[in-house]
Amino acid sequence: QMNMKTRPSRILSLFKKGTIGTVQKINLADPRVIEIAALSGVDAVWLCNEHVPNDWLGLEGQIRAARIHDIDTLVRVSRGSYSDYIRPLEADATGIIVPHVTTSDEARQIVSWVRFHPHGKRALDGGNADGQYCHLPIDEYIRHSNEERLIILQIESPEAMENLNEIAAVPGINGLMFGPGDYSHRIGKPGQHMVEEVAMARK
């Protein structure tokens, strides 16, 4: 019988140690760019389905390139149906970044879509890269997906800042990420990332 091994998250391991990882944002679809980033020493690459015209096959190739070099892949998803959230994970991304989260109810809905039982109601397949094409035992697949896959929420508006503590308290969330571009836009100062209101929110 084959001994199927799962890959732990580098970023999550660093989180648990209280240290900071390096993440490189990549807007190019060529998987060789991912390999170059990995060889430069980063811990993870950040790919984007919100603003970048990635297709699913191309994204899968980028994730595979990262996996070859043992670095994490974080995919910023499009806001949409549950499949927009789980397909990067099924392609074996290490985690997702969900933009424009404003309330704890939204955060709980995201967890429900992305986590498996007993933490959520994610649709169960296992026949993709993250389940090693049905070679990974189902209990190990569920455990690994729940424990080693990240959910990071972007805080990008004054409304989200008002609800920050409630959002952060939702079980199943691994981290919050501030979005200065949209935050500056929402306060009527688009692109002014260094003004006091944005700087204070970033803290």
How would you name each of these model-derived features?
Residues 26-40, 79-87, 159-170:
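Short, acidic/polar
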Residues 56-82, 86, 90, 112-120, ...:
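Alpha-helix-loop-beta-strand connector modules within alpha/beta enzyme cores
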Residues 33-61, 181-196:
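Glycine-rich, proline-tolerant flexible connector loops at the mouths of alpha/beta enzymes
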Residues 15-31, 74-78, 149-162:
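Active-site mouth loops of central-metabolism enzymes
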Residues 2-25, 135-147:
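N-terminal amphipathic alpha-helix/helix-capping segment at the start of soluble metabolic enzymes
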Residues 83, 95-171, 185:
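Conserved anion-binding
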